[in-house]
Amino acid sequence: MDVFWYALVGLLLAGYLALEGFDFGVGMLMPFADTETGRARMRRTIVPLFLANEVWLVAFGGLLFGVLPVAEGELLHALRLPFLGVLCAWFLRDAALWFRTAYEGAGWRRTWDIVLAAASLFLAAGWGAVLGMLVRGLSTGSHGHAVASAADLTHPFTLLCAALAVTGSLRQGSLFAARSLPEGSSLRVAFGRLTRVLTPILLVLPLLVAALGTVATDAPVAVATTAVLAAVGVYASDRVQATGRTGVALLLGAAPLVALPALVGAVNGTTVLATRAGVGSLELSQAIADSASLALMTAIVLPALVLVALGQLWFWRVFAGAGNRR
């Protein structure tokens, strides 16, 4: 059961990244809409969907605290500066989405469009970098605990994972925004071209992750397998998109974003927080909550997650086409 709960925590994070990838991508693309009508329509494609998507982040944080209380504290300590940056970007992204319509001034709206794009870019890159560092393993501080050093943050493998998250989000955003724009509109055509440009890049990036992972991690086969599956997902997404099935293409196109948290488990196994030296690492057996707490969560959390998933399905069915209807 310990592995089940650990996997469920990872699944919630993967679900958050898969869904928020649309929002990150649309946010990054917002300033490139050439008219106010186009920018307003793009905003409506992700409002209020981004709130529903953030439920998975809240669920991830709550379950991490409940199931892996020791790991939660160690992760926040080791990654406090990267997490602080991601948290600030999250606040700014949400503020930009809400405050943009609070005042009619063109300068006001343009400013928030730029904030939205920058915060969305930082969010995508930040999550990619954090997960890349966890895959590779953190440094060990003088106190004997795991810590994310400047060298960890700027390592080529970390930067490559950040680039994968940004590019994957951009492709998802261009696909998602285009489906809500009028057929034949200049913005829809532009996003279609962008998708075609990003697809080959996103086919190559996972393979670069696999290549670099052979020397940056101790599990080259796990890295290569996960990365190749991500590339296959992108290829399948491109083929499906050519037939006009955008919904399925979006589902398959989330593969690179899902691959990032999957890599953490595939490479590190039951080591919840890995360090390259081994000192300061945290094993699942050390981090997991006691059996009484897990039994309580089995009775309460699992049914609640099922209800949340059903609510999400309804929410997406109702609001996913909001950009077209308003």
Per-segment meaning from a language model:
Residues 166-180, 305-321:
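Transmembrane alpha-helical segments in integral membrane proteins
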Residues 5-16, 76-89, 117-121, 152-168, ...:
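Alpha-helical transmembrane segments
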Residues 274-296:
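Short, membrane-exposed interhelical loops at transmembrane-helix boundaries
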Residues 1-52, 58-62:
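N-terminal signal-anchor module of multipass membrane proteins
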Residues 32-41, 104-107, 183-185, 321-324:
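Juxtamembrane helix-boundary/capping and inter-helix hinge elements in multi-pass membrane proteins
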Residues 249-258:
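Central hydrophobic cores of alpha-helical transmembrane segments
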